[in-house]
C-alpha cells in the first residue's frame, strides 16, 4: 500500500500517520478515503490552525463556522444562512459546468441548514480581458452561473468582477448564497444513535470522482485528463431536491441534514457521524446508481450533483419517503448510525473499509514558517513618480477600464428579480437589498476584494476587503452582522505562499475585531498557481447586514437641487491605485492606509443619516477615486452635479482611500446632517449641488466638465464588447 500511497500523492509522513492511527496497513479503499478526506480541500491542513484566531461570536450569531453555512438572526423570528464557496479548479477546466455546479453546491449548503435560498452573489477573477482565454473563461462562467441560478429560480443580485494578470492561468469563481429561515427551522449535520440515514436526490454516477483531491493541487498545462473530475449539474433536478428537502424540514420530519459535496458519500456520512459522536455503517449496494458496475471506490468518491443525506426523526421514515416520492426523487436508507465510532463500508456483504471517524475527520495540520516575497516588498516600497495627465481624458479612460466599467453586460444575463424580494436592483446601490416578505425588514449583502491591494500588502488588502464590504452594506442603510470569507491563495508549501496565507487571515482578524463583525462561515482554496506563479492573495469577503427595507439608500442622484457632501478626506493615495496602473501600466506603491476606528465611525454615521431620513442617496468612494464615484452617481437617473475640489493633483481627483462616503441632503436639512457629523468628530466637506446634464468640477487648475452622455458611453461599452465579441 505504501507504493500506492506514493502513486496517488499521499506524503510519506501522512502515510505513516495513517498506519499509526489504524494500527495496521490500510487497504486500497481505506487509503483512497484518507486521500480525499485529508486533502487540503476537505481538511484545511494548512489554514485550520490560522483560522482559529478569527472572531466567531456576536449577538446576532446563531451558527458559526463548522456547519454547512453560518446563520445570523435578523429579527421578528427570521434568520439568514449564508456562505461563500469556490469552484476555481473545475471552472478553469470546464468554465460552464464548473461555475454551474459551484452554484448548485452552495445552494445545497444553504438549504441543508433549513433555509430557502433567496439570493446569489458571485465573485469572479480572470486574466486580462484582451486575451482570448480570459474571454472564453468569462463567457463560460457567466453562462454557467446564469444557467443554474435562473433555472432553479434563485436570483443573482450582485457580485464582484476583476481582471488581473495574476489570474491568467488560474481564474477564481466564488459563489455566495443567502437563505431565509425561521429560527426554529434551523438544522445541523447531526444524528442520534441507531437512526437510518437516507440518500436523497440524483442517482450516483462516475462524474466528479477525485474532485476534492483535484481542487487541492496546482493546475497543470494539460487539462484534458482533469475533465472527469468536473461534475455535471442539473438545475431542474436541483429545484426538485430543494423543494422536497425544505418541505421535509417544514413538516418537522428530519433531525439532521447534510449536503453531499466534495468527497461525496465519504465526506457527508463520516462528518455527520463524527459531529454526532457516533459511527456509521454504509451499505453501498443500496446506493441508487445510474451506471453499471461501479466499484466501492467510485461509489464512495463520486461527486455527482444534486444529492443530500437526511436523518429522519423516529417514526417519520415513511413520511419522508412520501415527500420525496411526490417530487419524483429517490429517497432510500443506505446507512445507519452505530455506537462504535467508525466509518464502516459494506459492499456485496463484505466489509471493504473500516476506519475511525476521528481519524478521517481530524487530518494532520501544518504550521509553517513564512517569508515575504522580496519582489512584493520591492514593488510596495517603489516611490510614485510625478504623474502628468489630462484629468478630462483620465476620467473617460478610467470609466472604460476593465475593472471600473459597467457590469450591466454581466448581470443582465442573470435573473435578478425572480422571487420578487429584490428591493435594490444591480447597479442601483452599493449592496444588494432583499425584502423579507410580511415584515419591515430587509437584508443587505455585498462581496468585496481588491487584488492590487492584496498583492502588494496581503494583510492590509484583507483588512480593506472586510472594511469595504461592511462600508457598502452600511451605505445602503444596513448594519453589518457577520461575514463569510472565501480565501483563495497559492501553495502554502513555500515560505512566500504561507506568509501570504498567514498575513491574509491576520488582516481579517484585525478588521473583524475592530469593526465588531464576526466570521460565521467560509472556504479556503489553496494551490491556485501554475508554473510556480501564485495568484494574488484573494480574500473574497461577503458581508450580510439588516435594515428597515423602506429606509434604504441608492447610489444615484435622484433630483436636482440637493446638496452633495463628502465624509472623509478629499485627497486619496496613488499607491496600488487604478489610475496609477492606467497611466504607467504597472502595479506598485503602498496601498491606502486604513484607520479602522475612523472606518467604523464613518459607517455608523452614514447609517444614522439614512435611518433619520436625512439622505436617500449615498455611495462609497473606492477604486478610481472621487471623480469616478461622482460619475457613477450620475448614471442611474441621469442627474448631473457641480462640485468644487480644493486639493490639487491627481491624488485629489483619482486617488484612493478608505472611509469616504458621498451623500446628498435637501438644503433645508443640511444643518442637521452636518451637526451629526460634527458631533462624531468626522471630517466632511460640502462639495456642491446636484443638477444638470453634466458633471462639472471646479479645481485649483481650472474647470473640468463632461457631458453625462459621454461618460455613460465610455462606461457602458467595454465589458459588453468582451462578452459579445
Curated annotation (Swiss-Prot):
EC number: 6.3.5.3
Pfam families: AIRS, AIRS_C, FGAR-AT_linker
A biological process term (GO) from this entry: 'de novo' IMP biosynthetic process
UniProt pathway: Purine metabolism; IMP biosynthesis via de novo pathway; 5-amino-1-(5-phospho-D-ribosyl)imidazole from N(2)-formyl-N(1)-(5-phospho-D-ribosyl)glycinamide: step 1/2
Keywords: ATP-binding, Cytoplasm, Ligase, Magnesium, Metal-binding, Nucleotide-binding, Purine biosynthesis
Coiled-coil segments on the chain, per record: none
UniProt keyword annotation of Ribosomal protein present: no
CDD domains, per the entry: PurL_repeat1, PurL_repeat2
Catalytic residues as annotated in Swiss-Prot or TrEMBL: 41, 87 (proton acceptor)
Domain of life: Bacteria
Binding site for Mg(2+): 430, 472, 620
Location of this chain's protein in the cell: Cytoplasm
Catalysis performed (reactions): N(2)-formyl-N(1)-(5-phospho-beta-D-ribosyl)glycinamide + L-glutamine + ATP + H2O = 2-formamido-N(1)-(5-O-phospho-beta-D-ribosyl)acetamidine + L-glutamate + ADP + phosphate + H(+)
Group of enzyme by EC: ligase
Similarity comment text for this entry: Belongs to the FGAMS family.
Name assigned to this protein: Phosphoribosylformylglycinamidine synthase subunit PurL
Organism: Thermus thermophilus (strain ATCC 27634 / DSM 579 / HB8)
Gene coding for it: purL
